[in-house]
Amino acid sequence: HVVRSLAGHLARTFPASTRALLLYPQGLDAACAFWACVCAGLVPVPAPAPDPIRLKYGLPRLRSIIEDAHVSLTLTTSRIAALSSELSLANETGPITWVATDQPYDSIDSIEWPQPQGNALAYLQYTSGSTATPRGVMISQRNVLAHCKALSLAGGVSDSSRSLCWLPYFHDYGL
């Protein structure tokens, strides 16, 4: 229900293929925002939430990702969105719209959901930037399905299987 209502809000408010930076603490909010973007036809760009203690390191990395990915939207929590003016994140085309996703959105029943195409961009994954500027990798819908199939075959996954991942959502294996 959370993913569907947020996806409906995003689909009504932003054009398809909008690049959406995801800035969340580790948890379900990040997963819901990621899948809401996918369902709405937006392109999620997962990144670590800024750590107030390490802003000197984190902000240049975030700014690099925003510029490279042409981000125009940030999805996050109300707590992090309240810091938006302090973070001064923008891109070359202007300010970034901030949306706090931890508030309820109306359920959407009559929306035409986009149908993903195999070569369409599913999401942008960025390297950590620990040794250089973060570099983005374009992950297609086909890449996601092939990866899921490979993991299913290697892990003996069935319809009744459940999994748990402790990696951060912005890590390539965290998704």
Where in the sequence are the language-model features?
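Short, well-ordered alpha-helical microsegments
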Residues: 28-31, 81-84, 174
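Generic beta-strand/beta-sheet core signal
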Residues: 23, 77, 124, 137-142, ...
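Conserved ATP-dependent adenylate/AMP-binding module captured primarily in the ANL superfamily
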Residues: 8-9, 50-86, 107-109, 147-164
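Motif I (Walker A/P-loop) of helicase-class P-loop NTPases
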Residues: 33, 140, 175
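Conserved AMP-binding/adenylate-forming
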Residues: 6-53, 166-168
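Conserved AMP-binding loop of ANL adenylate-forming enzymes
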Residues: 22, 154-175
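Short acidic, glycine/proline-enriched helix-loop-strand junctions
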Residues: 84-101
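Conserved pre-ATP/AMP-binding loop-to-beta segment of ANL
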Residues: 98-133, 138, 143, 147, ...
